[in-house]
Every structure is written in C-alpha cells, then in structure tokens.
Amino acid sequence: MLVLAIETSCDETAAALVRDGRSILSSVVSSQVKDHAVYGGVVPEIASRKHLETIPAVIGEALRLADVTLDHVEGVAVTQGPGLAGALLVGLSVAKSIAFARRLPLVGVNHIEAHLAAIFLEREVAYPYLALVVSGGHSHLYRVDGIGRCTTLGQTLDDAAGEAFDKVAKLLGLPYPGGIEIDRLASAGDPDAIAFPRPLLHDGSFNFSFSGLKTAVLSAVKKQGLPEGKSLADFCASFQKAVCHVLVEKTFRAAEAAGIDRVVVAGGVACNSALRREMAHAAAARGVELMIPSPSLCGDNAAMIAVPGDYYLRCGEQGGLALDARVNWPLDLLGSGREG
C-alpha cells in the first residue's frame, strides 16, 4: 500500500510517500526555526500560518521526489494529535480534502505512537520493546507490545527533557533552538565541572521531573553570573550530563523491571550526541539491544506517521471527514488512546 503521510503537529510541515509502512519513497520536511527564533520559541499562531503557506509545496515536492502522482496513492495518514490545535487542523484539513477528492481511506495517527514506530523504517524490531520518547513536550517510557498496544510506565511530571534544554538555553542567552546549541557547546566542556541535581533519580518510580534542575541552573546563574567561554561549555556539559544521566538510568531500570532486553529511543532529543553515546554505553554494559533511529527520523517527520498509518488502514480503520484535532492524546493499552 502506498500511503501519503502528513505531519503538522508543531513547527515542521512534513509530507512523505511510504510503501507498506516500511519503504520511504520520499520524505520532505520544511522547518520553521527561522520564523520562531526571534521569539525564542514556537508561537502557535505563526506556526499555523506557516503551515498554511507551506503545505501545498511540501506535498508537491514529496510527490515529485517519489515520482508518483495522487493517482498512485492508496491511503492517507495524518497526525491527529497531540500537538498545537491550529497546526494540527491545517494538516487535517488538507488530508481530508485529498482523501475526499480522491475517494481514499483516511486515518488519524497519534504523533507519539509514530515516534515509537519510526525505527521500523530502518529495521524490524521484535515485540515487546521498551521505548523512551524524549522531545520538547514528552519524556515518557512505554512498554510496546505492538502497534496500538502501548502501556505507559513513566512520564514527565512537569518539564520534558527537550523543554528543559530550551529553557536553560534561553537562560544562558543561547539562540533557539537551544537544545542543539547546548549539545554543540557541551562537546568542548567538562561534564563534571558542576554537580547539578538528578531529579527523581532514586524515587523508585519511572517518572521524570526537570523543573528542579532548571531551577538549579537559574540559581547558579544568579550566583555566578552568565558563564562565558570555557565556563559556558562546562556549564552546558554539566547540565547535559545531568539530564542524560536521569534519562539513561530510568530507561534501563524500567527495561529491567519489565524483563525486556530491547530498548528504542525516539523523539527530537534522541538526536543529542551525549544521550546517544550514554545510551549505547549503558546498553552494552547491560547486554541490552539498543535501537535509535537516524537523526532525520528522530525529529518530527511525516514518514514515521505512515508506519502506524499503514497498519490502521490495512485493519480497515477510517476516520473520514469526522477526524478532529486531539491536542491531548495520551497513549494507553486500549488502542493507543484511539478510543480514549
């Protein structure tokens, strides 16, 4: 089955043509980073307007690169949530229009479930596996027993990891997106220069909390002033190590508790070089199989939407014109929240 997938949950406008939920014929992502950089973060209204301006060209380019037309498409999959309401509605409206005009089946996809399934675009993974999704809005641990069969084991109680990276970067006066800049600066720093706290590391749960770490950073800046040069690199490296330490330890503790020896890490923060490195070291030490998608599949993209989309379309599921944006759409065991 050839699926046209569309993703507009936040500030990336993306479209992809994927065959059988595995083979990427094309994947186009248009970033809005420059549009939001001046504000230091994503502005929902601007994101929606940019999606409206960009999505026709993005879909057209995806079709061109795949060397197909809409006549070849057999189904449409679109991000239904979670995400920004206005942004989601742009993608949904376009997907509905195409599906209606072409009489194609249409299915809504959970953005987070798509992150969990992105690894299948590069390799097959046996179920069950333990998955960590780390992004600007999520730091969640899941047991994955199949598409539509996800159980939440732990989640962020306040700031997600990606949000913490961006907020700390803003405190330090770094450009947006802050997570990338912290990773870059940290490569030249000493990760043991500052002993930042590890929130909830020993609380016995698999939940995360990064607001306290953010407060510790703010206190350090107020006490010492804004770091510069080598001190800034050390500061970034120490903060990054604290975040990665908690993510790594809780992930593998959860895997051990669940009796699972396969771990998948996904989401935009999975692009972070230190996290990828520390996850690899921890997996090797524990004899656990670690799988992290290529960076292009960790950030928001439409190709990953096609993986669960293809599955649900084959199961005969159709959302039709009734599909609406689901700003909050938690995964759970019952159909990955599709009925929740």
From Swiss-Prot:
Q: Where does substrate bind?
A: V133, V134, S135, G136, G137, D166, G179, D183, N272
Which EC numbers does the record give?
2.3.1.234
Cofactor, free-text remark: Binds 1 Fe(2+) ion per subunit.
> What is any one GO biological process for this UniProt entry?
tRNA threonylcarbamoyladenosine modification
GO terms for cellular component: cytoplasm
Q: Which reaction does it catalyse?
A: L-threonylcarbamoyladenylate + adenosine(37) in tRNA = N(6)-L-threonylcarbamoyladenosine(37) in tRNA + AMP + H(+)
- In which compartments does the protein localize? Cytoplasm
Named from the GO MF annotations, one term is: N(6)-L-threonylcarbamoyladenine synthase activity
Q: Which Pfam families match?
A: TsaD (PF00814)
Supply the alphabetized keyword list.
Acyltransferase, Cytoplasm, Iron, Metal-binding, Transferase, tRNA processing
| The protein's enzyme class | transferase
Instruction: Give the residues annotated as coiled coil.
Output: none
Annotated residues for binding of Fe cation: H111, H115, D300
> What InterPro entries is this protein classified in?
ATPase_NBD, Gcp-like_dom, KAE1/TsaD, TsaD
Q: Superkingdom, according to UniProt? A: Bacteria
Cofactor(s) needed, names only, are: Fe(2+)
Q: Which family does it belong to?
A: Belongs to the KAE1 / TsaD family.
Role noted for this protein: Required for the formation of a threonylcarbamoyl group on adenosine at position 37 (t(6)A37) in tRNAs that read codons beginning with adenine. Is involved in the transfer of the threonylcarbamoyl moiety of threonylcarbamoyl-AMP (TC-AMP) to the N6 group of A37, together with TsaE and TsaB. TsaD likely plays a direct catalytic role in this reaction.
Which PANTHER family does the UniProt record give? TRNA N6-ADENOSINE THREONYLCARBAMOYLTRANSFERASE, TRNA N6-ADENOSINE THREONYLCARBAMOYLTRANSFERASE, MITOCHONDRIAL
Any idea what this protein is called?
tRNA N6-adenosine threonylcarbamoyltransferase
What organism does the record attribute this protein to? Geobacter sulfurreducens (strain ATCC 51573 / DSM 12127 / PCA)
Lineage at the top is: Bacteria, Pseudomonadati, Thermodesulfobacteriota, Desulfuromonadia, Geobacterales
